[in-house]
Amino acid sequence: MKTYSAKPSEIEKKWWVIDAKNIVLGRLASRVANMLRGKHKPSFTPHLDCGDNIIIINAEHVKLTGKKANPKDGKIYYRHTGFPGGLKDTTAGKILSSKHPERVIKMAVKRMITRNTLGAKQMSNLYVYANGDHPHMAQQPTVYDFASQNPKNKK
């Protein structure tokens, strides 16, 4: 029996909408990363973008477990400006209470996707919105009920 390898013309992409209200961030990011890669499909092919398009709404209401949401000493995100002594840091709590709370979900998913051009293409299929509105109604997305799959998903 030969290993199945999908062709680009055979790939069908679905649109999913996920409500992130009171959902644990790491569990959500892990599932979304697998769906963006297409690993939930039996026709998964590692070298092709066979994942689906994901819309996440209510990103500002995502939950972090433990002390990670603490704005003072919670989960720390580091970045570097490129200049000497340019290491900057911020916490997940500060990002969630700032102007762009959707960045926490995007960073969590991005760090679970492969770091190459295919991963960048797959990340372009992720749409995250801070509130409950999204402009993708024309694509007729299917609601993905993530909270009811496992009681640990919701907090």
UniProtKB/Swiss-Prot annotation:
A GO molecular-function descriptor: mRNA binding
Keyword DNA repair: no
InterPro entries assigned to the protein according to its UniProt record, in alphabetical order: Ribosomal_uL13, Ribosomal_uL13_bac-type, Ribosomal_uL13_CS, Ribosomal_uL13_sf
Entry keywords, A to Z: Ribonucleoprotein, Ribosomal protein
Keyword Ribosomal protein part of the UniProt annotation: yes
GO cellular component term, pick one: cytosolic large ribosomal subunit
A Pfam family this chain is assigned to: Ribosomal_L13
GO biological process, alphabetically ordered: negative regulation of translation; translation
Stated family: Belongs to the universal ribosomal protein uL13 family.
Its biological purpose: This protein is one of the early assembly proteins of the 50S ribosomal subunit, although it is not seen to bind rRNA by itself. It is important during the early stages of 50S assembly.
Self-association state and partner proteins as the record states: Part of the 50S ribosomal subunit.
UniProt-recorded name of the protein: Large ribosomal subunit protein uL13
Native organism: Rickettsia felis (strain ATCC VR-1525 / URRWXCal2)
Recorded name of the encoding gene: rplM
